[in-house]
Amino acid sequence: MKKIILSLFFLITNVYSISAQNEAKKLLAIFAHPDDEQSVAPLLVKLVEEGVEVTLVIATDGRLGVNEYNDNKAGDGLAKIRRKEMMCAADILGVKLIHLDYHDQLKAAEGFDGHVPHAQKLILELKNIIDKVKPDAIITFGPDGKTTHMDHRLVGASVTQVFLSQRWGKPMKLYFHGMPSDLLGSQKVRTLRGQERSFLNVQIPFTWDQYDKAYQSLLCHESQYPAEVVMKMKEDKKSFGNRIYLRQFMSSKKVKNRLF
C-alpha cells in the first residue's frame, strides 16, 4: 500500500512539473505612447513566435504627438487616429493590446492638482493589470526613458514602483530596455540615454525576418512616420545589430547594516 501511495505521489508530482513546464510564459510590455513598442518590437515578434503570451500596455492616448510630417492638431482627433494605428501595429506583432487613455504628459500642464491624481491613477491601474495578467516578466523603460521623454520616464518609474510595492504571488522579473553607450554618438547622448554594456545583463538576438516584421508594424503609425521615414530608420538601425538589450532589475536578499 505504501508503495502504491508513493508511486501515485511521484506520478502526480511529475505530471504537475510537466504541466508547469508546458504552460505558456507571459510577458507584459508596458510603454507610454503608441509607437513606443518599436523599441522592443523585434523581441515581441520573436517571443510570440516562440509561444509566449505577450500583452502590450500603452499608457497614453498620444494626443500631443504632432510633428512636421502632417497637419494633425493635438487633441481628441489625433488620439482617435493613434488608437487605430496602435491596434494595427499590435495586430501585426501578434500581441494582445491594452490601450489606456491617459493624456500625454499626464496632465503636467495642470500643475500638482491635475498631474498627481492622474499619475497616481495610472500606478493603481498598472497594479490591477499586473494582478490580472500575472506575467512571468515585465519590460518597460529604464530611468533614461530612451529619449529622456518625461512620459517614458514616468511610465517606467510607475511600473517599477508597482513591482517593488509588494511580494507577488508568483516569481516575476522586471527588465528595463536599454542601449549600449558605445553604440551612441556623442558623450552627451551617451550620458542622456546610454548604459555601459556590463549593466545590460540580458542581450537577446533576433532574426532579420523578425526585424522586418517589426518595421512592418511601424508603418501602421502613419501619423508619426511616413513610409519613407520608416524605411530609412529600418536601414539606419541595422547598424545597431540584431539584439535587444535589457537590464534586469536585481536586488540582494541579504540585508546589510552599512553602505560600504
Which residues make up each language-model segment?
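Alpha-helix boundary/capping residues
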Residues: 11, 133, 162, 218-222
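Prokaryotic Sec-type signal peptides and long signal-anchor helices
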Residues: 13-15, 253
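The feature marks non-catalytic terminal segments
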Residues: 166-260
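Active-site beta-strand->loop->alpha-helix modules in alpha/beta enzyme cores, enriched
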Residues: 18-169, 259
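Sec-dependent N-terminal signal peptides
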Residues: 4-13
